[in-house]
Amino acid sequence: MFNQKNVAFVITDPQVEFLKSTGKGFGATKDVLEKVNTIENLTKLLALAKERGYKRFISPHYFYPHDHKWQFKAAGETMMIENEMFWRDSQYSAIPEGSGADMIEEIKPFLDEDTIVVNGHKIFGPESNDLNLQLRKNGIDTVILAGMNANLCVDSHMRELIELGYNVIVVNDAVGAPGEEAYQAA
């Protein structure tokens, strides 16, 4: 049985960009989101975590104007930066309501003082943010993982967290992916 002291829920990229029709990545994820009922299941998962007193961590995706100046980029980074996906004008300004970088409305009721939103990751895992630090400082050794995209950020987070010694459980109906093949591959 899980306990609230060492188990946490980690959600990757629960943002408009992939989860809502106004997002630039939604066209690629729409079919899987509908098939597995991702948004509803993600919302239920967060409601359960909050109700039972588990810590919740959000590992979002963000890009800023200074990211355009990188000396090299992976193909996925190039595509996201050129299309201004998960875009924020500055790390010092608020995220525009409803923008691709904004969290979806369905999960906002669960983003409270007991939710830790870690620094944004770039591509694709938590190596470039403070998720590991936050989990360790909170005494977490087991992660229940969900979010977007199953074959990219969820998979990379899972692999890195396992390498770091965490027990990881992926909730396969609370993830989405850019197509059925990508969903099945993950």
Task: Name each model-derived stretch.
Residues 1-8, 17-18, 35, 44-52, ...:
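Active-site-adjacent betaalpha module
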Residues 10-12:
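Short hydrophobic beta-strand that contains or immediately precedes a catalytic carboxylate
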Residues 19-35:
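Acidic/histidine-rich helix-loop elements
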Residues 27, 48-50, 56:
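Polybasic, low-complexity intrinsically disordered tails and interdomain linkers
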Residues 38-39:
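Glycine-rich loop(s) and the adjacent beta-strand/alpha-helix scaffold that form part
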Residues 54-61, 171:
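Short beta-strand segments at enzyme active-site cores
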Residues 60-62, 121-122:
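Acidic carboxylate-rich catalytic motifs and surrounding loops in phosphoryl-/glycosyl-chemistry enzymes
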Residues 64-68:
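Short catalytic/ligand-binding loop motif for oxyanion handling, primarily in non-cytosolic enzymes
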